[in-house]
Amino acid sequence: MSITIQNLNKHFGNFHALKNINLNVPTGKLVSLLGPSGCGKTTLLRIIAGLENADGGNILFDGQDVTAKHVRERKVGFVFQHYALFRHMNVFDNVAFGLTVLPKSERPSKGQIRAKVEELLKLVQLSHLAKSYPHQLSGGQRQRIALARALAVEPKLLLLDEPFGALDAKVRKELRTWLRDIHHNLGVTSILVTHDQEEALEVSDEIVVMNHGKIEQTGSAEAIYRKPENAFVTEFLGETDAFEGRIEKGFWHYNGFAWKLDAQYKWQEQTATGYIRPHEWQIAAEHETPMICAEIEKIHAVGALTHILVKHDKQDVHITLAGSDAARYPIAEGKELKLIPKQVYVFSQNELIEYSI
């Protein structure tokens, strides 16, 4: 089922929570609403579900306007951060619950319900826990059961509100891979709310980056990461360091270093900020003009990566090198490091000037 959102607005008193939201979610895609707390992503999810009313605009499911329809009529499945499993019911009954409360005319037979629940428990790989109760399960197992329960009623749309937020990092990573596989197998149109950039980049077919009630950028995970359209998206999608430079004659200049801008973009001479991610630095060769010369303050090796903190012009700059690259150079605290970037994202007044191709 496709989702179309047209000119959606929502106020809470004087607070404008959603500002003219327009969005298309293609059939069968997993789309993440990504943004910081208070950006409007959960409010948008609740309006799509029918749990909240918009002040203006329309929501269409497969081209049919459902803006005024009750949540029960929208055939939506929910998975929340805190599971919402019934403590007094075992796993089997929790998964079956949505089917048992359907109107009599729509309710499957007991045999059909049993077959459906067994199928879903097999899908989430928890058939052996059918008789267990929620308090006997781990957090990851509870969330799998919550998803199985949401899928039991065969929703046309699956909505997930920070489903892994309460779990530890290792379990979150495991469940992200699992969710991606489940979605690939079922093909249910799904919308995931998250503030976790890594989660969105890993599981999504498309990402919608939100801030202050507006959509900043929509695109594939690769496009959002490789071609950010403004400074907010660049900074929100991972650690960056910012450098104030100037655009002149098709180059962004900083500290004697020049970064050539793409000729297809219009530019004018102006001040502009260059953003560089930690892993997009490299140590300058003898013949290269470095962008910065900085003293190493801290070195921290983590597995195959070496994280380096340097001080440049009273600014902390973060560098991440592959262990093999770090081993080729005499890196030590207190020594000077000459660096050039592999990529610079350049913006002027939050407007895109350059991105990687």
Swiss-Prot record:
The keyword Transport applies. This is Sulfate/thiosulfate import ATP-binding protein CysA. Its EC number is 7.3.2.3. SUPFAM superfamilies: MOP-like (SSF50331), P-loop containing nucleoside triphosphate hydrolases (SSF52540). ATP binds at G35, P36, S37, G38, C39, G40, K41, T42. The complex is composed of two ATP-binding proteins (CysA), two transmembrane proteins (CysT and CysW) and a solute-binding protein (CysP). GO terms for molecular function: ABC-type sulfate transporter activity; ABC-type thiosulfate transporter activity; ATP binding; ATP hydrolysis activity. It holds the Pfam family ABC_tran. Belongs to the ABC transporter superfamily. Sulfate/tungstate importer (TC 3.A.1.6) family. PROSITE patterns: ABC_TRANSPORTER_1, ABC_TRANSPORTER_2, CYSA. The keyword Translocase applies. Part of the ABC transporter complex CysAWTP involved in sulfate/thiosulfate import. Responsible for energy coupling to the transport system. It is found in: Cell inner membrane. Keywords: ATP-binding, Cell inner membrane, Cell membrane, Membrane, Nucleotide-binding, Sulfate transport, Translocase, Transport. Residues 3-237 form the ABC transporter domain. One of its GO terms (cellular component) is ATP-binding cassette (ABC) transporter complex. It catalyses: sulfate(out) + ATP + H2O = sulfate(in) + ADP + phosphate + H(+); thiosulfate(out) + ATP + H2O = thiosulfate(in) + ADP + phosphate + H(+). It is a peripheral membrane protein.
